[in-house]
Amino acid sequence: MAVAFGSVGIHVGVTVGLDPGRDKVGWAFVGEGRELLVSGIFPAGERALFWLGLRALPGDADALAPWTLEAPLPRGEASSRMAFVTAFVVGDGTCGGELASSLEAQDFGCPILRVDERGTTLEARTLYWRLHGPSWWQRLLPRTLWVPPRPLDDLAAWAIAMRGMAGPVD
């Protein structure tokens, strides 16, 4: 599989989005159709363990299990597709440069793209409700009052990956 960067972004394979932060890092494996394969959050202090987990794929399908929050696809399908990582997209916010440098040092053999992550937390809220749907009583409230019951860093990473796949905005 090949990866091409051009006027329309990243093509072919699986893209890993990373939403860096001081305390935790959201991650998401995203297919070529922008579908979420699997996502989660790991503590920033466990970055080295997360890199080891990435290297263990696809042989060890449970390598990322300790940090996994969303896995909408059947386990076998997701783990087989996760082996074909062709690019990483890192948000340029808090600690983004540090995470990108650490990722480069790992030498995964994939390009690393930095994108503007402004607004991805709000996008993550929308993605959460698309995956889970609000309860009947939440539907009675305005959408702005729908608050997801968990941190959304992994879904922000999904939004970051999709931005990288969309290509540069002129």
Task: Indicate residue ranges for each PLM-predicted region.
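Phosphate- and other anionic-substrate recognition elements at nucleic-acid/protein interfaces
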Residues: A2-D170
